[in-house]
A protein has these predicted regions:
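TPR-repeat structural position
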Residues: 6, 39, 73, 105, ...
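Single-residue signature of alpha-solenoid repeat helices
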Residues: 9, 42, 76, 108, ...
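Structural register within alpha-helical repeat arrays
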Residues: 29, 63, 95, 131, ...
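Non-heme Fe(II)/2-oxoglutarate
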Residues: 373-472, 494
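Catalytic core of non-heme Fe(II) oxygenases with the double-stranded beta-helix
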Residues: 436-450, 454-554, 559-586
Length: 586
C-alpha cells in the first residue's frame, strides 16, 4: 500500500482479513479499501473495530468520512459532532471540514472560526480557509472575501485562498474577475487542483464557448484528470462537437483503469451504444477480470437489453454496487415485494438519497401498500402558486415575464441537450442561473421564488409530519436554494422521468408557454409519479399539471417527474430549481 499498488494490497488483505483480529491491521485494511473505492468493505471492517470497542478518533474519522463520501450524511454528522469535542486541533479541523461537506454550515463555521483564532497553531490558516468557504456557503460573500484575502501564511495556502475567491467570483457571476484570477493561478508552477476546470466553467458560464473549445484542444493529456475529462465531455456534447466521447476513449486506451472504465461505459450505455459498451466490457475483463466494476457495467447493459431474468442470475460481487439494477429487474418482472426489499436495502445504505427513496415509494405503490399515502399525497406535498409579480415594468405581469425571458436568453449558450440530464431535444443554461446574474428581472424572480417556497416550507405541513418521514428527517437546518437553471424547449422536447438527487424540495417556474398547451390534452404537461424504468403493471401518474406563464410548482425532490412532448408553434421556457442544503461550490 505504501508503494501505491492498491490492487495488490487489497488482494493481500482479502486473503487474510477474515481471521485478522489486530486492530491496527484492520484499520490499515479499511484505509486500503477506502482508497480503492471499496467503501462497503471498509465500513464492514470499521464496524468490526467498533464491536471490539476500538473507537479511537482516527477510526471514527475514517468511518465518518466514508459515510460522507456516499452521502450518508445522516450517519456521518453525529460522528463529526463527537469528534469536534475532542481537544485536538487537527481532529477538530477534520471534523469541521466534515460538517461543512455534510452541509451543517453553522456548526462548521463555529468550529472553524474558533480554530482560526488560535494564534501560532499550524492549523489556524487552514481553518481560516474553511471559515471563508463557510461564509460563502452562508451567502456572506463580503465577509468571506475579507477572511480569504487575509490568508498568506504559506504560498500554498495563499494560492488556495485565491482559488476559493475565484470560485466565489464564478459562483456570483463575476466572470471577468474569476477568469483573470484563474489564469494567473494556472501560470504558477503548481496551480491549485481544479483550477483548470474552474477556468473552463468560467468560460462556459460567461458564454465564451469558442474560447472553451480552444482550451480543450490545447490541453495536454498529462494534466487531464477525470474531473477535467467529465467537464470537457459535457461541453463537447452540448456544443454538438463530433465524437464527444473521444477524450474518455483516448484516456482508456492510454491508461485503462476502473475509474475511467466506469465513466466511459456509463456514457456509452446512456447513449444506447451497446456495441461499443460490449467491446469495452471485453477489454476490461481481459486486463482486470470480471470484478465488481465489470459486474456493475455488465448488469447495466443487461438492463438496457431488458434481460431481467439474467440480471437476477448474476453473482453479485458487490451487492450495493449493483443493487439498483437488481431492484429495477424486480420491478420489470412484477416481483414487487423483492423490489421493496432491495429499495429498503438501498435506503439503509444511503439514507436521504432521493433516488433510493423514489424506488421505495414506487415499490409501495406497486404493492398498493397503504404506507405510500404518507409519501405521495399530492394534496399535501405538491403546491402550485401564481403570485403577484414585482412591478418592474409598466406593463405589469406580461412585461415582467417577458423581461425574465429576455434576461434568460443571455445565459443560453449551448446548442444541444446535456447528455447526463433529463431533457431531450432542448437546451439548458450552464451554471447556477439565479446566483450568477446581475439582471434585475432574474434577481426579482429569485426573490419571488424564495418568498413562495419559504411560505410553504414554514407551514404546518412540515411541523405535523412524523419524525421518520424523509421530508422531516432530511430537512436541512437552514433551507436555501442551492441550484437553478433554465430550459428552453420547442416542439418535440420532453424530459425523461427523473428525480433531483441533490435536492430536498424541487420546483419549476413557467416563463414562456406555447398557446397550444391546455387542459384538454397532456401535451407539454408536467407529469409526477411515473418511474423511468419498466414496471410489469404500469403506474398511473400522481398528477399531471398544465403549464401556465407565471405558475410556480413545488414538489419533493424524491418525486419522479417528467414532461410530455408537444407539437405546434411556440417555445416553452422554464426555470427549474432545488432547495436543500447550502451551495458549497466555493
Amino acid at each position: 500500500m505504501e508503494k501505491g499498488d492498491l490492487i495488490a494490497a487489497c488482494s493481500l488483505f482479502d486473503q487474510s482479513i477474515a481471521t485478522e483480529t489486530d486492530p491496527n491491521a484492520l484499520f490499515q485494511a479499511a484505509l486500503c479499501y477506502r482508497k480503492s473505492g471499496r467503501l462497503n468493505d471498509a465500513l464492514s471492517l470499521l464496524k468490526r473495530l467498533e464491536d471490539q470497542g476500538q473507537t479511537n478518533p482516527p477510526a471514527l474519522l475514517l468511518r465518518a468520512d466514508i459515510f460522507c463520501a456516499v452521502d450518508r450524511h445522516h450517519h456521518a454528522l453525529p460522528l463529526y459532532q463527537a469528534l469536534s469535542g475532542i481537544d485536538n486541533p487537527q481532529i477538530q479541523y477534520s471534523a469541521a471540514l466534515g460538517l461543512f461537506q455534510c452541509g451543517d454550515i453553522d456548526a462548521a463555521l463555529k468550529l472553524a472560526s474558533a480554530l482560526a483564532e488560535r494564534a501560532t497553531h499550524p492549523i489556524n490558516d487552514q481553518a481560516a480557509l474553511l471559515k471563508g468557504r463557510c461564509l460563502a456557503a452562508a451567502q456572506r460573500y463580503d465577509e468571506a472575501r475579507q477572511t480569504l484575502g487575509k490568508i498568506d501564511a504559506t504560498p500554498a495556502l495563499q494560492k488556495a485562498a485565491t482559488y476559493r475567491i475565484a470560485r466565489m467570483d464564478l459562483h456570483t457571476g463575476q466572470f471577468s474577475a474569476a477568469e483573470a484570477s484563474l489564469r494567473n493561478l494556472l501560470d504558477l508552477d503548481e496551480p491549485p487542483r481544479g483550477a483548470r476546470e474552474t477556468l473552463l466553467q468560467s468560460l462556459v458560464h460567461s458564454g465564451q464557448t469558442d474560447a472553451a473549445l480552444n482550451m480543450i484542444r490545447e490541453a495536454t493529456d498529462a494534466s487531464a484528470d477525470l474531473s477535467w475529462l467529465r467537464h470537457c465531455t459535457e461541453l463537447l456534447s452540448e456544443l454538438d462537437q463530433p465524437d464527444p466521447l473521444q477524450l474518455l476513449a483516448s484516456r482508456w486506451d492510454k491508461a485503462p483503469g476502473p475509474e475511467i472504465f466506469r465513466e466511459l461505459c456509463n456514457r456509452l450505455l446512456e447513449a444506447n451504444d451497446l456495441t461499443r459498451a460490449e467491446s469495452l466490457l471485453k477489454d476490461y475483463a481481459k486486463t482486470f477480470g470480471q470484478d465488481a466494476h465489470w459486474q456493475w457495467a455488465h448488469m447495466r447493459k443487461l438492463e438496457k437489453e431488458r434481460a431481467y431474468e439474467e440480471i437476477l442470475q448474476c453473482k453479485q460481487v458487490d451487492p450495493f454496487g449493483s443493487m439498483e439494477v437488481v431492484c429495477h429487474a424486480h420491478f420489470a418482472l412484477g416481483r414487487y415485494a423483492e423490489a421493496l426489499e432491495a429499495a429498503q436495502q438501498l435506503c439503509r445504505s444511503a439514507p436521504g438519497d432521493q433516488y433510493f427513496i423514489a424506488l421505495l415509494v414506487t415499490a409501495l405503490r406497486c404493492l398498493d401498500d397503504p404506507r405510500q399515502a404518507a409519501l405521495t399525497d399530492s394534496a399535501l406535498f405538491l403546491t402550485e402558486a401564481e403570485p403577484q409579480v414585482p412591478a418592474l415594468e409598466a406593463g405589469g405581469a406580461t412585461d415582467f415575464w417577458r423581461s425574465v425571458e429576455d434576461a434568460i436568453a443571455h445565459h443560453h449558450s449551448m446548442t444541444s441537450a446535456p447528455p447526463t440530464q433529463s431533457v431531450v431535444d432542448g437546451i439548458q443554461t450552464p451554471g447556477n442561473l439565479l446566483t450568477q446574474t446581475a439582471a434585475p428581472p432574474l434577481i426579482a424572480l429569485k426573490a419571488l421564488l424564495d418568498e413562495v417556497a419559504h411560505r410553504f416550507f414554514d407551514g404546518t405541513l412540515f411541523k405535523d409530519l412524523a419524525e421518520p418521514h424523509p421530508l422531516r428527517l432530511f430537512r436541512p437546518n437552514s433551507v436555501s436554494m442551492h441550484a437553478s437553471w433554465a430550459i428552453q424547449a420547442k416542439a418535440g422536447t420532453y424530459h425523461h422521468s427523473h428525480v433531483h438527487s441533490k435536492g430536498w424540495y424541487s420546483g419549476t417556474c413557467y416563463v414562456e408557454v406555447p398557446e397550444s398547451l391546455n387542459d384538454s390534452a397532456e401535451a407539454g404537461h408536467l407529469v409526477l409519479g411515473e418511474p423511468p424504468f419498466e414496471t410489469k403493471d404500469p403506474l398511473p401518474p400522481l398528477a399531471t399539471l398544465c403549464p401556465k406563464v407565471g405558475k410556480i410548482v413545488l414538489f419533493p425532490s424524491y418525486c419522479w417527474h417528467s414532461t410530455r412532448p408537444y407539437s405546434g408553434q411556440g417555445g416553452r421556457q422554464v426555470v427549474a430549481f432545488d432547495y436543500g442544503k447550502a451551495n458549497r461550490f466555493v
